[in-house]
Structure formats: structure tokens, C-alpha cells
Amino acid sequence: MENRLIILGSGAAPGVPSLGTGFGRCNPENPKNVRTRASTYLEYKGVRLLIDTGPDMRAQLIAQNIRNVDGVLYSHAHADHLHGIDDLREINRINRQSLDVYAGKYTMKKIEHRFDYLQEGYQQRYPPSEPGNERGQGQQAFFC
């Protein structure tokens, strides 16, 4: 197995082009100026590591035909580096085991707080929404 490093995305937090400023000073004619949020895939001695899980992660992995990773390293707790974390559940289904997650203490605390439902032993706190169920003020029901 070969070692490899793939830059999955290198765009700023809003992506390029952004909704607000478009391409900014970047040339829209250059395809390299269409960039997804920052993420990197590292494969070394058979270990597959994802660095950050931005909101574009699923599309990035599909584009590179990456279907599995062994772990994730988080650089920091900004949304553009971790809000694709929910898509790791599909990788859990493939592996049938938990993923190793690495981060500094502050970042790990933020992840555990924002995404508590991803932790082992999580108990669902709300009954599933079904057509016809009433919700009180302040509660939300989504039907997909």
C-alpha cells in the first residue's frame, strides 16, 4: 500500500466562491479557484486519517473515492473544520466500529458538547416526530 496525502479542500470558511463576495479577487475562469472548505486525507503505512471534517466532507470523499478512514484529527473547533462530522456515522456503519478521534482538550470539549449524540451510550431525548403528533410551544418537528 502506498503512502499518500490528498488536500481535499483549501477554501476559506465560506468556501470559494462565497455566497457574499463570490470569487473576490480570484479569477472565476480558473477552475482551481472553486474550492471547498479545508480538509486533508493522509494514508501512511496502512492507516487512513482524515484531518478535519468540514461541511463539504461527504462530497470531498466521494470525489476522491475515499470510502473509509480509521480516525480523524481535528485542528480546531470552528464550524468549517468540523460541521461535516455527522457524515462520519456512515463510515461507522462501514467499519462497524468507532473511529479514533484526536483533538486538543478545548476542541474535544466543544465536539462532545455540540455533537453529544455521536458519543457511545447516547440516549435519544425526544420521541420521533410522526405526522399528527402535536408539539408544544418552543418545540420543533421536522418531517423529511
Summary of predicted features, one role per range:
Residues 1-144:
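Binuclear metal-dependent hydrolase catalytic cores
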